[in-house]
Curated annotation (Swiss-Prot):
Protein name, UniProt field: Luteothin monooxygenase
Classification via PROSITE patterns: CYTOCHROME_P450
Record pathway: Antibiotic biosynthesis; Polyketide biosynthesis
Domain description: The hydroxylated intermediate probably changes its conformation in the binding site due to a sterical switch of the enzyme, thus allowing the second oxygenation-heterocyclization step.
Enzyme Commission number, as recorded: 1.14.15.37
Source organism phylogeny: Bacteria, Bacillati, Actinomycetota, Actinomycetes, Kitasatosporales
Catalysed reaction equations from the record: luteothin + 4 reduced [2Fe-2S]-[ferredoxin] + 2 O2 + 4 H(+) = aureothin + 4 oxidized [2Fe-2S]-[ferredoxin] + 3 H2O
UniProt xrefs under Pfam families: p450 (PF00067)
Length: 406
């Protein structure tokens, strides 16, 4: 990319943003100025789409294919189990293999299954609120961690008592998708992958002899039908688990952080719980847990709005910045759950790689926000937050809260 950046004339006047800098902030004036100057910017890793219309368009553009495999090469992830998993992860695939495996992975996220799981989600939310400690506590460990883990156990047919193990295995595995070449992280991810696959193989073998009405059984049936092999079987179950857990976990934590900054918005939900779905959409717009929501690579030479994109160029869509685009969102820099935004969030990407768990994530977020706001006073920050800053999932790993006086 760096060589192309110096030789492609149409890039000469594009702004440059280094989002790999530890001190970088998506909310900085520098980023807003870059978006006003151009719809796209140069970065150390890729071209970065900053405006909503172009990000929405290019996330679905067939001239761009999944860029994840190229990113693995770019950051220099060494040969081994971590690299193997990342390049075989569903979001790394394109074409016939992607369509075949994605078709199987959609089973837990069909409208029928989402409707069927809603009572479980609602009752789980209420039970978790009942168990919240009094005073100051880490909200992540007591709510965003167990909720999606329990839901994924329910959908995959895993014992509910395994939720903590399942969630932590997902966290360890997802570190690999952060595209780090740090040896300590790679060792941790490799160990986590080993534990993850040990757990999944045991669950899969059980479903081979005792099938049920769950996703693991559905995928095992496809294995018996010869649609996928043993390696694809366990990798696909792992993909669904990671996709269904990690982003929901951090998005829930980000929602509470947002409402701690805007307690008046919390009170509006308390007074009118029917605002919860719209509040979730505003959270997704304001603080998407995937700031860079789609990573693509140009499969051919083409041009967009005067910018030439040569074959092989990585192109990233930045949901965080696009969601503050004043061309699309009125009062874009104001968090307001009462405003019905005309443009939908692009937090879940678009095109063939649109996030599988979108409907499930929205369900969990809506049920959680509605119940928490109805039963509790607005959240207040009660200590130092531990933030995760990476190319993939971002948000609080630890969020000390108290639900104080309204």
């Amino acid at each position: 990319m760096s060589t192309t950046a110096h030789t492609e004339p149409s890039w000469a006047d594009l702004p440059f943003l280094d989002f790999t800098d530890p001190n970088f902030s998506w909310d900085s004036p520098e980023v807003a100025e870059a978006r006003e100057k151009s719809w796209i910017a140069r970065t150390p890793l890729a071209l970065l789409v900053l405006r909503y219309a172009e990000a929405d368009q290019l996330a679905r553009d067939k001239r761009l294919i999944s860029g994840f495999r190229g990113l693995v090469d770019m950051v220099g992830t060494p040969e081994g189990p971590v690299r193997d998993f990342m390049v075989d992860f569903l979001q790394s695939l394109d074409g016939a293999d992607h369509r075949r495996l994605r078709g199987l992975a959609t089973h837990p996220f069909t409208p029928r299954r989402i409707t069927a799981v809603q009572p479980f989600v609602r009752s789980t939310v209420e039970q978790l609120i009942d168990k919240l400690p009094q005073g100051d506590f880490d909200f992540v460990q007591h709510f965003p961690h167990p909720l999606p883990a329990l839901v994924m156990c329910q959908l995959l047919g895993f014992p509910l008592e395994d939720y903590d193990t399942v969630g932590r295995l997902s966290i360890e595995t997802n570190l690999g998708l952060a595209l780090s070449n740090d040896q300590d992280i790679l060792v941790k991810v490799e160990q986590g992958l080993g534990r993850m696959f040990d757990y999944l193989v045991a669950a899969i073998e059980k479903r081979k002899v005792e099938p049920g009405d769950d996703l693991t059984s559905d995928i095992v049936r496809a294995f018996h039908d010869g649609v996928l092999d043993d390696y694809e079987l366990r990798t696909l179950v792992a993909t669904v688990l990671v996709a269904g857990y990690e982003t929901t976990n951090h998005q829930l934590a980000l929602a509470m952080y947002d409402f701690a900054q805007h307690p008046d918005q919390w009170m509006k939900i308390k007074e009118n719980p029917e605002l919860a779905p719209q509040a979730v959409e505003e959270v997704l717009r304001w603080s998407p847990t995937l700031p860079v929501t789609a990573t693509r690579v140009a499969a051919e030479d083409f041009e967009v709005n005067g910018v030439r994109i040569p074959t092989g160029t990585p192109v990233f869509m930045c949901a965080h910045v696009a969601h503050r685009d004043p061309r699309v969102f009125a009062d874009a820099d104001r968090f307001d759950i009462t405003v019905k935004r005309e443009a939908p969030s692009i937090a879940f990407g678009g095109g063939p790689h649109f996030c599988l768990g979108t409907a499930l994530a929205r369900l969990e977020l809506t049920e959680a926000v509605a119940a928490l706001a109805t039963r509790l006073d607005p959240p207040q920050i009660a200590g130092e937050i531990t933030w995760r800053h990476e190319l993939g999932v971002a948000g609080p790993d630890a969020l000390p809260l108290r639900f104080g006086a309204a």
